[in-house]
């Protein structure tokens, strides 16, 4: 019986060795034909953790789970008109430039306001801008920029404005069923591999439409077919909620709006989280406002009545004064921002690793003094 078992083990081992050799030969042939890295074992990849770029909003970074937009992925931002979609995208552009990257903006709507973009922190002198004549031209330009590998972020505003050339050349009233959907489907197939290879972030802004005759369920849909929905790793639903009234002389005026950004699809972290931000007219997302709100919830900033304080020091009476204080003290803003990100696991706690034990430091000083004394005696 023992001999039979041993013989079976030898046959299995021999068969396994032959399969392993056949696999190694196949991998060598594939590598020879298609280049190194065409097929690899998942554990051999140097970068298993998804690289991200901050969205420019702390609340949105937290909602995204990974700490920002994943690099080498497609992002879709959609919502009703004037909900803040372009504002969210422009904050990403400003962040990409802040990190030393190059950003491109495909303005298919021909409606980009350079002054507003600059107010959000975008360096308009360095921003690559294209206002294409047709959808095919816009997507082709985006493809060439992505293929270059030199662009970190490409924004397309918007998918609904990417009009196929056949529709432009035709007459108003002509029926062009499915043209835009086919164009977007082909573009996604061509762009997705290049986007992943070059680690470019591609943001597609989209509008909302309503399905005709829908009695039950959500009648809202996005134009451009289903391809973008499938290929997007992250989909954000941006909707304004309530108006923000001013203070003092502006108490009867609207100075901004509360906005909810819902992560309706997320392939790199759990979805369906919501970021609540304040979009101020002419300024964009209030970074100080969202920081005060989140830090107060975590008790990093303490609130007593109308007063806000940090580390026992008062930083303002009322949220507006606290916002101004943080805006005037960027070092303090960065310190609190870092603590919040550490709390949510978006950053490692560098303070703990950098902290020095006072007793150990004193011991090191004594050792150095002793060494100096010995050298003098010598």
From Swiss-Prot:
**Ranges that cross the membrane:** none
Name the UniProt key words of this record, in alphabetical order: ATP-binding, Cytoplasm, DNA damage, DNA recombination, DNA repair, DNA-binding, Nucleotide-binding, SOS response
Q: Out of the domains of life, which is the source? A: Bacteria
Q: Where does ATP bind?
A: 79-86
Cellular component aspect of the GO annotation = cytosol
- UniProt record, GO biological process: DNA recombination; DNA repair; SOS response
Give an example GO molecular function.
Answer: ATP binding
Note whether ATP-binding occurs among the keywords.
yes
Q: Give the chief site where it resides.
A: cytoplasm
Q: Which regions form coiled coils?
A: none
Q: Where in the cell is it found?
A: Cytoplasm
SMART domains xref list? AAA
- Write out the function statement from the record: Can catalyze the hydrolysis of ATP in the presence of single-stranded DNA, the ATP-dependent uptake of single-stranded DNA by duplex DNA, and the ATP-dependent hybridization of homologous single-stranded DNAs. It interacts with LexA causing its activation and leading to its autocatalytic cleavage.
Family according to the record: Belongs to the RecA family.
HAMAP family named in the record: RecA (MF_00268)
What name does this protein carry? Protein RecA
């Amino acid at each position: 019986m023992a001999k039979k078992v041993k013989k079976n083990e030898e046959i299995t081992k021999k068969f396994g060795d032959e399969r392993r050799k056949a696999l190694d030969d196949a991998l060598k042939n594939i590598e020879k034909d298609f280049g190194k890295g065409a097929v690899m074992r998942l554990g051999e990849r140097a970068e298993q953790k998804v690289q991200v770029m901050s969205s420019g909003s702390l609340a949105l970074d937290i909602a995204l789970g990974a700490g920002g937009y994943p690099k080498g992925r497609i992002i879709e931002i959609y919502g009703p008109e004037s909900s803040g979609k372009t504002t969210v995208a422009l904050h990403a552009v400003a962040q990409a430039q802040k990190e030393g990257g190059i950003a491109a903006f495909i303005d298919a709507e021909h409606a980009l306001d350079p002054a507003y973009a600059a107010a959000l922190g975008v360096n308009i002198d360095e921003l690559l801008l294209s206002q294409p004549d047709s959808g095919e031209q816009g997507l082709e330009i985006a493809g060439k920029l992505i293929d270059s590998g030199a662009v970190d972020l490409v924004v397309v505003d918007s998918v609904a404005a990417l009009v196929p050339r056949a529709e432009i050349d035709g007459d108003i009233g002509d029926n062009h069923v499915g043209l835009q959907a086919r164009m977007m489907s082909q573009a996604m197939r061509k762009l997705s591999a290049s986007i992943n290879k070059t680690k470019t972030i591609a943001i597609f802004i989209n509008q909302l439409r309503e399905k005709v005759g829908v009695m039950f369920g959500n009648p809202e849909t996005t134009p451009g077919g289903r391809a973008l929905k499938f290929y997007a790793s992250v989909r954000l639903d941006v909707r304004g909620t309530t108006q923000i009234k001013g203070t003092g002389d502006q108490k009867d005026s609207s100075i901004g709006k509360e906005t909810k950004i819902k992560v309706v699809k997320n392939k790199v972290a759990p979805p369906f989280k919501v970021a609540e931000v304040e979009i101020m007219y002419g300024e964009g997302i209030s970074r100080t406002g969202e920081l005060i709100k989140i830090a107060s919830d975590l008790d990093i900033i303490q609130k007593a009545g109308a007063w806000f304080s940090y580390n026992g020091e008062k930083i303002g009476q009322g949220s507006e004064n606290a916002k101004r204080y943080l805006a005037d003290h960027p070092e303090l803003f960065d310190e609190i921002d870092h603590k919040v990100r550490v709390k949510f696991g978006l950053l490692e706690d560098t303070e703990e690793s950098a902290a020095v034990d006072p007793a150990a430091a004193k011991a090191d000083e004594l050792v150095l003094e002793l060494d100096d004394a010995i050298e003098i005696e010598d």
